[in-house]
């Protein structure tokens, strides 16, 4: 061993450890994608709280709780897809447990659950409000919103709010599926290497 300021051991330049200190590529990919998947789940939770804020008036109505400030907002009643999408947050626990244990099957179930409970409701929302958004996008500047069939909330087209939500939701869930797929691929490659050896 070399001492500080002392002579170097003969036969080495101090770099002989580099080839032994590398982490295998599949482990690097797994670690990177686990971190990114957790960020996506965090953003999914943030979107859930946005949806929960929208659903609060309906939930309070079902519980027979009256809050004047919330009632004054006159939030439109929710559609079924909003509750289905809000329930998609529960799938995050499946994804987190799969990531913690490197479980391929559970991660695949998580991907299917995200597709069914998060992405499909967003597609429904996209199709449901398409006519309003298209009419708003092609509207002449001389025509007032109140003169059209476009559903308006607080002076703005309601469908445009949902399109903004869908835009962010598609990005979050798309990246979630991408990172989950990369994890499944890395874990399968690692188990295939173990079986081969």
From Swiss-Prot:
Output the Gene Ontology cellular-component terms: endoplasmic reticulum membrane
Against InterPro entries, the record matches this protein to: Jagunal
Keyword entries, A-Z: Developmental protein, Differentiation, Endoplasmic reticulum, Membrane, Oogenesis, Transmembrane, Transmembrane helix
Q: Which region is the signal sequence?
A: none
Cytoplasmic compartment ranges equal 1-39, 100-109, 181-197
Q: Per the record, what phenotype accompanies loss of this gene's function?
A: Mutants can't increase the size of their oocyte during oogenesis.
Family designation: Belongs to the jagunal family.
Tell me what else is known.
'Jagunal' means 'small egg'.
> What is this protein's name?
Protein jagunal
Which species is listed as the source?
Answer: Drosophila melanogaster
* Phylogenetic placement of the source organism: Eukaryota, Metazoa, Ecdysozoa, Arthropoda, Hexapoda
What gene, per UniProt, encodes this protein? jagn
């Amino acid at each position: 061993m070399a001492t500080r300021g002392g002579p170097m051991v003969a036969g080495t330049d101090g770099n002989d450890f580099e080839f032994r200190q590398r982490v295998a590529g599949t482990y690097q990919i797994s670690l990177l994608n686990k971190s990114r998947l957790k960020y996506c789940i965090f953003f999914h939770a943030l979107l859930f709280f946005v949806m929960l804020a929208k659903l609060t008036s309906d939930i309070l109505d079902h519980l027979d709780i009256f809050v004047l400030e919330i009632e004054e907002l006159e939030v439109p009643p929710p559609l079924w897809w909003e509750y289905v999408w809000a329930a998609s947050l529960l799938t995050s626990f499946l994804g987190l447990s799969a990531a913690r244990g490197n479980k391929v099957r559970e991660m695949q179930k998580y991907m299917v659950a995200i597709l069914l409970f998060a992405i499909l409701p967003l597609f429904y929302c996209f199709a449901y409000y398409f006519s309003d958004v298209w009419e708003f996008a092609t509207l002449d500047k001389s025509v007032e919103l109140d003169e059209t069939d476009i559903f308006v909330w607080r002076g703005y087209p309601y469908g445009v709010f949902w399109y903004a939500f869908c835009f962010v939701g598609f990005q979050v869930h798309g990246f979630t599926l991408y990172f989950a797929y990369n994890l499944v691929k890395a874990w399968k490659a690692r188990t295939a290497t173990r079986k081969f050896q």
